[in-house]
Amino acid sequence: MNSTFKVVFNKARGALMVVNEVTSSVQGKGTKTVVAAAVAAMIAGVSGSAMATETDTEIKATDTALKATFTKAETQDNVASSLIGTLGDKLVLKNVTNKGMYAAGSLDLTASSADNVVTLKNGSVSNFSGKVTSTNHFGAVVTATTGTLKIDNVTFENNKFDEVKTGDNPHNGTRGIIRAAGANLEVAKSTFAGNEAVLGGAINVWSNGENTVKITDSTFTGNATKSHGGAVYITGSQVETTIADATFSKNTSGKQGGALQLAGAGETTITNTTFSENAAGTFGGAINATGTKVAATNVTFEGNKAASADGHGGALFVDGQGASYTQAGGKFVGNSAKKNGGAIRVQDGADLALKNVVFDGNTAANGGAVDTFNAGAVTFTDTTF
């Protein structure tokens, strides 16, 4: 059943949002973002005080996704304009410059309850650029805060957002190109290439609740961050993550987790996945698992590196009480660290258990294959060095 919604500029969030027509208000009387199934909004080139045009545009929404919709948004001074086009189940967004996002992102997807699902399918999002202009606000290309966001066969390419200078705190600024903050996230058959953001070059998951992340049959190539998580950043002790049949290659981070940063995340499962030629400045050329339990099966780490003079764990860095990494099958080949643990570094109470794993040609100043420091239980079964 179709429902009618209205495009409204939310001045406090600095973004266009789609709201239930009955509850909407463009006079700032507390617009409520209630959407039966899917909400899409975008703003281009708008500062925090600029007002967008065409706030009365009506769109139709079905139970699963927006259909046959074109919405144009312009700044007061016509610095830039942008276009959302959703044709059937196909989404195409490209060549957009956003000069000043606040809390909201370019595409703000909201479900009316935790049971609802928002789906992006069969499309591309490319060449977005911009920056967040306010401390502690976290714009992204796509933001989801409730329900479940599904991304199916979508390409995100060359979307780049500037870092906000807020002292030494790495957690301010643009969090991922995809940001799930309190929402479940499912990514399937999708590609993330050449994206840049502050925490998580492609995906950021940040939750205080029981949420799930599922990434399957997807590719992450050449994504980057100056901070943590070159491709993916996940935090939240109750967030359960599953990664399967994925490829992470040539992603980079200035600090930790060249491909994947797990920062106090919940239980994480990685299966039939390859990490190759990823690089981090300090900890975990491919994966940094801090305070996180990871169970891996048939995972390959090849040619990853912790590149700085203080580089630890060319492929994998596992840290902290309660943290653990187990792997059955797979290999660590040609990984390197400038300092400790050419393939793996385990420290400060973290556990490591490997079975049927092969190490070959890994290098470091100390511990060419594995280096430990005040680690918990470390076991190797049928493992080749």
For each predicted feature, which ranges?
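Gram-negative bacterial Sec-dependent N-terminal signal peptides
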Residues: M1-T4, V8-A52
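Assembly/interface hotspot detector across virion components, adhesins/toxins, and nucleic-acid enzymes
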Residues: F5-V7, E54, I59, A111, ...
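Short N-terminal segments immediately surrounding and downstream of signal-peptide cleavage
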Residues: N10, T55-K72
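A generic structural signal for beta-strand entry/edge sites
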Residues: R13-A15, A65, V117
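Low-complexity, glycine- and small/polar-enriched segments
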Residues: G48, A52-E54, T75-V79, I151, ...
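Extracellular beta-strand/beta-solenoid scaffold signature
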Residues: K67-I84, T97-V117, S129-A144, N158-A181, ...
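Right-handed parallel beta-helix
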Residues: T71, G88-K99, T119-K131, T148-D162, ...
